[in-house]
Amino acid sequence: MSEEELLARIAWFYYHDGLTQGDIGDLLGLSRLKVSRLLEKGRQSGVIRVQINSRYEGCLALEDTLQKHFSLKQVRVLPALANMNLSARLGVGAAHLLMALIEPQQLLAVGFGETTMCALQHLSGFISSQQIRLVTLSGGVGPYMTGIGQLDAACSINIIPAPLRASTAQVAETFRQESSVRDVLLAACAADIAIVGIGAVNQQQQATIMRSGYISGGEQLMFGRKGAVGDILGYFMRADGELVEDMQIHQELIGISMPELKTIPTVIGVAGGEEKAEAIIAALNGQYINGLVTEEQTARVMLNLLR
């Protein structure tokens, strides 16, 4: 590991994860004095500013490998750190990436999920100052409120006024034909950048779509038996990235479709945890996302699965 990469890891742990210099020294096998000197060197050299100004903000070798394998436009792999809130850390990483990509007054489309909502929380001031417009990618107001509820009241936000999932395909189609719903769906398709979470079938009760009550435990087991490994916006994918066929839920969803998601120029998937590795690969295989924010251990598991 080069000194610059070591410095960037130390800076991330210190400024974003709140570890003490002693904790970082124990984690990396360095003395507290060495950690302190590297932080000071980083500040003097300009590597450390308000943000971590370094190409080693993530884990460069893993980023390069994933970028080349999947032809990604953007990829960030955060350094592994045990016993920290992974969704919050990924949210910070995603927020930093979006701040570097999105231009003033552009339209950002957002999918539901704990990690994407963490990113929105960290983007709150940036969204206001840059006059970024927001639109949701799916129905279901509840799953979005932990992120949208933190934004300035003056922010431009278009929310699909419908549930994520209707009781039948016919009811879902009726919702989609309502002008108030249709107009937001059209706006979502015209977004400049999108950020989405990736769910894993093996998450069990932890998945947002389950915790929000949109699918049952029995349905999740059935989806797994049909070959599903994960989902984006409630659309379930096989390991090869193809959508699982004959899934009633796909006709009952209210939101943009996967082909429509692919028309958005930049779609960033944000997900981490070893249990999500296969689902992330499926999303990449299906080319539903062309950017990724994840963490080091997840990336290593992904690469092992690809061998």
From Swiss-Prot:
Residues 21-44 bind DNA. SUPFAM superfamilies: NagB/RpiA/CoA transferase-like (SSF100950). GO terms for cellular component: cytoplasm. Inactivated by phosphorylated autoinducer-2 (phospho-AI-2). Phospho-AI-2 acts by binding to LsrR, which is then unable to bind to the promoter regions, allowing the transcription of the target genes. InterPro entries: HTH_CRP, NagB/RpiA_transferase-like, SorC_transcr_regulators, Sugar-bd_dom_put, WH-like_DNA-bd_sf. Transcriptional regulator that represses the expression of the lsr operon in the absence of the quorum-sensing signaling molecule autoinducer 2 (AI-2). It also represses the expression of the lsrRK operon. Acts by binding to the intergenic region between the lsr operon and lsrR. In the presence of phosphorylated autoinducer-2 (phospho-AI-2), LsrR is inactivated, leading to the transcription of the genes. This is Transcriptional regulator LsrR.
